[in-house]
């Protein structure tokens, strides 16, 4: 039996998007201050987690997700709260994960679904399908095929390293993973996380890119692309969709960085570095974070409405 090759065809649109993304990643990487901003990394990670869970119908708000991650008391559904804790723990492992390891996949799934599903960290033992109301619109491969299909997929990733661009490979993996539906629950969250892990291994700037938030904005199109691929029997539509999402997410980051560099004073840049996204701050809290001695200093360093 020959090596497994996921069906897809490289298009001119894919090549154009890969070129555009590569250029934008280079621009962002040249702004070395991104790497020195742990608050930016954490804020974007919180956004990623909130969006990925929201896609799967978790009802907690961005502020509530942040509070859970920061250890504050949140009144809400306990399963949803546990999902946030699990997702944060899983995302914190990104730099340690080997994206070519099936054992790592199961281990991270065990973290992602801790205390929320019965079959945690193991491939599913039952049939799975996708329903629209009472109508089944997709039937996943039978459970006795899952292990072999996942072995084939990971073998393809290993054998294709260096010959297939990571931007293409990660999108193909994402779709194939969703098609196989290897776990009883958490497949969407794991597919999006593994996509990010593969991108991070290519360029670590993706640690700061909340791609999941872009997907959440275009959630209907995300599922439409997957459904079209099921019908077409290849992942072409999904590859183009995901490359477009990455390209747009990078545009937002570049605009953010350019605006900061062009219009903000050094003190304001410091404020942005220490302040968390979507969190209200008192003057005293900002003074303490910036080591300022008086509110006069704070007023002098604050951005004008034009800069905000």
Positions of PLM-derived features:
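FIC/Doc superfamily catalytic core
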Residues: 1-302, 306
